């Protein structure tokens, strides 16, 4: 579990935070049990974008996957600007050890890519470079979470497990990492860039998954201001189990 400052919760009713202290303690115990750090057996890895958040996000290289460890708490404020009813409060998550996020080291283009419409309405579809998971732009009812007013000023909110996650592209991270590095990685292994190409050029020719091939025939996704906002499914090979990508953290 990585250190984080209590100022992250300065916008919330601290009395409610104390009410869930028992839950947070339980999560901490689970974290300590699950946290057989990847660093104990695996070498550290460098993936573009993550290095700017090295104090709170660790990346390791396994046989088939990069493993991303974080506590799921971003440096920015949370839950401010939500227009719909939201009772959850963000708490530290045990994304470490066997619960680390898995990103394929060698992404493979799928023979039959899967759209996010009607699929992957549970769990994450990508991981942002600040260690926060990104869910489908559609909530578990199939509605656009942004248009429904469910998201805060940073494009995120909490799930029922008090896990903070985004539903749209966290382009605000470019104020930290710049525009040349990915802002996230889809769980099929392909990188996700901002609304422009890394060289600053206008993005053209996106497919229905919000991605395309570059001049070197490498595939990547882009953020957009309109749906699907982030990767609209998976151009690469993934396994779907009970409506979500497997493995999850």
Walk through the language-model features, giving the residues of each:
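Long, compositionally biased interface segments
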Residues: 209-249
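Short loop/beta submotifs within extracellular cysteine-rich repeat domains
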Residues: 111, 134, 172-177, 192, ...
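Extracellular structured ligand-interaction cores
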Residues: 98-100, 122-124, 151, 161-165, ...
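Short helix-loop boundary/capping segments
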Residues: 147, 151-152, 160-200
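Solvent-exposed N-terminal domain segments of exported/luminal and surface proteins
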Residues: 41-130, 135-141
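Extracellular/lumenal glycan-associated surfaces
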Residues: 130, 160-173, 216-227
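N-terminal secretory signal peptides
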Residues: 1-16, 20-31, 39
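Short, recurring structural edge motifs at helix starts
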Residues: 149-156, 205-211
């Amino acid at each position: 579990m990585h250190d984080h400052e209590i100022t992250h919760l300065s916008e919330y009713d601290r009395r409610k935070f104390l009410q869930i202290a028992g839950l947070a303690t339980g999560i901490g115990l689970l974290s300590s049990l699950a946290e057989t750090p990847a660093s104990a057996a695996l070498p550290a890895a460098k993936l573009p974008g993550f290095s700017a958040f090295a104090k709170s996000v660790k990346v390791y290289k396994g046989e088939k996957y990069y493993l991303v460890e974080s506590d799921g708490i971003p440096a920015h404020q949370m839950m401010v600007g939500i227009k719909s009813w939201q009772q959850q409060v963000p708490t530290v998550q045990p994304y470490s050890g066997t619960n680390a996020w898995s990103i394929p080291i060698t992404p493979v283009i799928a023979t039959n890519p899967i759209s996010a419409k009607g699929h992957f309405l549970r769990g994450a579809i990508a991981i942002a470079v600040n260690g926060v998971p990104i869910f489908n732009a559609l909530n578990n009812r199939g509605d656009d979470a942004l248009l429904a007013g469910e998201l805060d000023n940073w494009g995120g909110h909490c799930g029922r497990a008090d896990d903070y996650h985004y539903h749209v592209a966290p382009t605000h991270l470019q104020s930290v990492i710049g525009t040349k590095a990915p802002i996230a990685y889809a769980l099929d292994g392909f990188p996700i860039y901002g609304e422009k190409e890394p060289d600053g050029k206008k993005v053209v020719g996106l497919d229905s998954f919000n991605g395309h091939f570059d001049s070197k025939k490498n595939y990547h996704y882009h953020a957009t201001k309109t749906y699907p906002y982030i990767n609209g499914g998976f151009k690469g090979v993934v396994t779907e189990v009970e409506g979500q990508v497997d493995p999850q953290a």
